[in-house]
């Protein structure tokens, strides 16, 4: 019977961890991130759900003769914001799996 109490304690601990993980995930999804390129000439904002919420392009980089440069800056700023989301998500969610020897984690 002693093992049953231990099992119940583990189950409660797992349920608590699941709630904490769900809250952390919800907080991450709502968090706003900002990516930039060209020294701030292009800014892309996104939320943790990986949804782009805003793109700001400084008019100084709008050159009809060099659309490719503008495209590169938008792409770089977008990749910057997505990397920030990925890194923050890995760091935050990794706290929950650290120390657990779970396959695939």
From Swiss-Prot:
Entry-linked Pfam families: YbaB_DNA_bd
UniProt keyword Calcium, yes or no: no
Record's keyword annotation contains Flavoprotein: no
Main location: cytoplasm
Recorded GO MF terms: DNA binding
Positions of the UniProt region annotated as Disordered: 1-23
CC per GO annotation: bacterial nucleoid; cytosol
Annotated Low complexity bias: 1-16
UniProt subcellular location: Cytoplasm, Nucleoid
Chain coiled-coil ranges: none
Matches recorded under InterPro entries: YbaB-like_sf, YbaB/EbfC
Family stated for the protein in its record: Belongs to the YbaB/EbfC family.
Subunit note: Homodimer.
NCBIfam families: DNA_YbaB_EbfC
Reported function: Binds to DNA and alters its conformation. May be involved in regulation of gene expression, nucleoid organization and DNA protection.
Name of the protein in its database record: Nucleoid-associated protein lin2851
